[in-house]
């Protein structure tokens, strides 16, 4: 018997203008998976949650899809049992499916000594995103696997990474609202099919400020680039009172605010050496509450990435 436990971090994608390109890994929360491999005459994958609930149709789940894809690709004759311990809220724009996918890919790579590079792990893990959302997008996968701020280039697949500036803090607030089924697919369906040249120019300007801010270690510059002329205007209709919540965070000192992934979570970047992140969180949750919507908040930092916790 082989056994391994791997953790992978939550992530927050897009950062305004960087749709499907920008992502940050978060130090908290994190999902973990336990993977047990038993020698067998054929390849078999079983998926469980920590409470023992067995999930049917593993092809429709991120972790199960990754485990099965790797087993098939490398002709692994094992019974593979994957147990997921979810700590990342599911379906709120924090990369829960990416974290499960990444943790499973890292576990399979290590336990079977496959020698996969980071780019190959990204290619394997993205199959879980495809199973979960119907699209192969690498941003959350990169943030969950590698951590930090990542710029994702898909053809050929590679990433460029930056460490966060000292004091950079992320406040995430998630409203408790009704969401459509297969939310990510629906959120993508809202996007415009054509983009005005002026809007594209603005977005390039915003995106370059984010990159320059990370390169210079300038939180204020990063915050000034967390704007979007294309995707956020189309998607914010899914989040009641988004503009008001955004303004409430900026008024108490947040450097910038953006929709985390496909939402409904909203992320604020704060210079924790100058501004109390708790004050920003309170302003955002209060704004939702003033409009009759409950919201949960968390304060975290940029970092994350996948790591092996136990191995035998």
Positions of predicted regions on the chain:
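ATP-binding N-lobe of GHMP and related small-molecule kinases
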Residues: 1-92, 110, 114-116, 146-147, ...
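Short beta-strand-to-loop capping motifs
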Residues: 37, 175, 268-272
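Short beta-strand segments
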Residues: 7-9, 25, 144-146, 153, ...
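Acyltransferase
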Residues: 167-247, 251-252
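Gly/Ser-rich oxyanion-binding loop with an adjacent helix/lid
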Residues: 77-158
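Short beta-strand-to-turn element immediately C-terminal to the catalytic PLP-Schiff-base lysine
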Residues: 25, 143-155, 267-271, 309-311
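Glycine-rich, charge-dense phosphate/pyrophosphate-binding loop(s)
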Residues: 214-312
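Short, well-ordered amphipathic alpha-helical segments that serve as non-catalytic structural scaffolds
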Residues: 61-73, 207, 245-247, 283-284
């Amino acid at each position: 018997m082989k056994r391994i436990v791997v953790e992978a971090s939550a992530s927050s994608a897009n950062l305004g203008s960087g749709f499907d390109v920008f992502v940050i890994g978060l130090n908290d929360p994190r999902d973990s998976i336990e993977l047990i491999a038993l020698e067998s005459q054929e390849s078999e994958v079983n998926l469980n949650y920590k409470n023992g609930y067995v999930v049917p149709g593993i092809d429709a789940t991120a972790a199960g899809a990754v485990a099965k894809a790797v087993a098939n690709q490398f002709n692994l004759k094992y019974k593979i049992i994957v147990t997921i311990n979810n700590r990342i809220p599911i379906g709120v724009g924090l990369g829960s499916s990416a974290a499960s996918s990444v943790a499973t890919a890292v576990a399979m790579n290590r336990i079977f000594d496959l020698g996969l590079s980071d780019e190959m792990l990204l290619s394997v893990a993205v199959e879980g995103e495809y199973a979960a959302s119907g699209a192969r997008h690498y941003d959350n996968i990169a943030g969950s696997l590698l951590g930090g701020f990542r710029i994702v280039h898909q053809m050929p697949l590679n990433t460029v990474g930056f460490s966060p500036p000292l004091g950079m803090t992320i406040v995430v607030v998630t409203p408790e609202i009704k969401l459509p089924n297969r939310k990510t697919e629906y959120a993508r369906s809202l996007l415009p099919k054509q983009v005005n040249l002026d809007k594209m120019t603005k977005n390039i300007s915003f995106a370059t400020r984010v990159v320059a801010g990370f390169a210079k270690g300038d939180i204020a510059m990063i915050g000034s680039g967390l704007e979007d002329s294309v995707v956020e205007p189309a998607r914010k209709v899914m989040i009641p009172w988004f503009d008001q919540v955004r303004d409430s965070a900026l008024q108490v000192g947040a450097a910038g605010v953006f929709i985390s992934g496909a939402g409904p979570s909203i992320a604020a970047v704060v210079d924790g050496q100058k501004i109390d992140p708790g004050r920003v969180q309170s302003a955002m949750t209060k704004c939702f509450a003033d409009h009759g919507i409950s919201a949960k908040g968390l304060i975290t930092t940029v970092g994350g990435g996948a790591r092996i916790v136990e191995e035998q």
